[in-house]
């Protein structure tokens, strides 16, 4: 018998049979993991199984490769976000992006900590810049981090103003020349220079979205990025 105990956030839930549910969670030590919750559709347990909920999880299976079953205890509910359209959109985007980005059962402890901190921040104003930084971390976890430290053409660290949509590397204003309109504008927020304006967050998310879409293309099989992320971008564009 295989067994472990861990803490995780619920990414998704679907009914299984008459009274059970299959949940997917992102855990601290075991990564993205699915399992059955017996009685998960019951009046007692179903209210606990809400996306974003932080859970104390015990997983058991006869063999490691089996789906196995979870027992769950609530640690933190995030149902308060149900009344906050932007916060709820952020939560749904986080859950959807973790689902499509992470391989099953592969630990990502730093990303887990940062994801929990971001989920905790969603009920406070001013969290979109943190979401942008989180997507940059997500890019790094896919193996494709942006290189914004120096100009890809000249090697200079000064006057970095653009990002190449091909390489993800910074380009200085002088080196861009006539190619500037084919490059992404580089918001100072991505360089960690000063507070991020709403426009800079939108510019930054256009960059991370471009590269996440490209890197995730084999997993998406021609499908677009998760609708939950598109919904968040739509709301941020109106803000």
Swiss-Prot record:
GO terms, biological process: DNA recombination; double-strand break repair
SUPFAM superfamilies tied to this protein: ArfGap/RecO-like zinc finger, Nucleic acid-binding proteins
Xref: Pfam families: RecO_C (PF02565), RecO_N (PF11967)
Keywords: DNA damage, DNA recombination, DNA repair
GO CC annotation terms, alphabetical: bacterial nucleoid
Family: Belongs to the RecO family.
Function: Involved in DNA repair and RecF pathway recombination.
Protein name stated in the entry: DNA repair protein RecO
Organism whose genome encodes this protein: Cereibacter sphaeroides (strain KD131 / KCTC 12085)
Lineage of producing organism: Bacteria, Pseudomonadati, Pseudomonadota, Alphaproteobacteria, Rhodobacterales
């Amino acid at each position: 018998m295989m067994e472990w105990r861990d803490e995780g956030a619920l990414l998704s839930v679907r009914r299984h049979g008459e009274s059970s549910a299959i949940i997917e969670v992102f855990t601290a030590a075991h990564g993205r993991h699915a399992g059955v919750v017996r009685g998960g559709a019951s009046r007692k347990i179903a209210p606990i199984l809400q996306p974003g909920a932080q859970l104390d999880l015990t997983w058991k299976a006869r063999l490691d490769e089996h789906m196995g079953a979870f027992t769950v205890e609530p640690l933190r509910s995030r149902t308060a976000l149900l009344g906050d359209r932007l916060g709820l959109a952020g939560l749904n985007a986080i859950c959807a992006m973790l689902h499509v980005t992470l391989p099953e059962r592969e630990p990502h402890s730093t990303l887990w900590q940062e994801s929990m901190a971001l989920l905790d921040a969603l009920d406070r104003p001013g969290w979109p810049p943190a979401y942008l930084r989180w997507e940059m971390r997500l890019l790094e976890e896919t193996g494709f981090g942006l290189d914004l430290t120096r100009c890809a053409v000249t090697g200079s660290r000064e006057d970095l103003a653009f990002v190449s949509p091909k390489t993800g590397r910074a380009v200085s204003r002088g080196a861009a020349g006539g190619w500037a309109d084919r490059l992404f504008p580089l918001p100072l927020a991505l360089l960690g220079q000063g507070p991020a304006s709403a426009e800079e967050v939108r510019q930054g998310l256009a960059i991370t979205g471009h590269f996440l879409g490209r890197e995730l293309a084999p997993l998406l099989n021609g499908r677009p990025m998760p609708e939950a992320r598109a919904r968040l971008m739509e709301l941020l564009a109106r803000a």
